[in-house]
Amino acid sequence: MLSDRKRAQLERELAKTISSLEGRQAGQLLKILGDPPKLDDITLELWETMGKEMLGVLTPATINTSLLAAENVVNSIPIGVNWDMVNQRAASWASTHNSRVVREMYGNTSQAARDMVADFYEQGLSVGDLRRRLQQRFGPMHSEMVAVTEVTAAAVEGGRIVADELAAEGVTMIESWVTQRDERVCPICYPRDGKVLGDGWTRIDGPPAHIRCRCDTAYKLPPMETE
């Protein structure tokens, strides 16, 4: 589990990097679309290239976040784990997870670009209107939402990797859902706060339970049995 301060730092850093990349990609799209805009040169290869660029941002950031969260869990208990396995699992998860995230992200952006160009002709938009809409699509809010969601996903995965490694050794940890417990907690996550895995939620439910979810998971060893 990450501290609030570390989480905020990781979110800011990732949002800044994503924003820089998306700003450049928005400019590239506008240049290729031309005036008047045409979709002829917006190819699948272009979207794939942009996706690879985003993977280059998300993958190292999420691996780092997962390992930081895993380290925090290990430091909170008197049992160690095979750190090489933790590293391998963090990298494997990041590769699979980020590929899915990027595929969905640029699939949605590709459709949005087609819709914007259609609106340009059907609704009589100006090139300036098109530019503003595209820049909003790639704007700071989008970057922040991606950063918050993916920091949450990576932090939670880091804790789960440690818990699963210990479970393989016969040590079952207690996993609990933890919200930020502030005025921004949503109605989806609020009922799950403090509840252990299996009590109204499964790992499929999250965290993250939704875009911009700021929740985390906490781990502790079960009580020692005494005779």
Whereabouts are the PLM-identified features?
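N-terminal leader/targeting and assembly helices and adjacent pre-domain segments
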Residues: 1-137, 222-227
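Acidic, glycine-rich two-metal-ion catalytic cores of nucleic acid-processing enzymes
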Residues: 136, 141-227
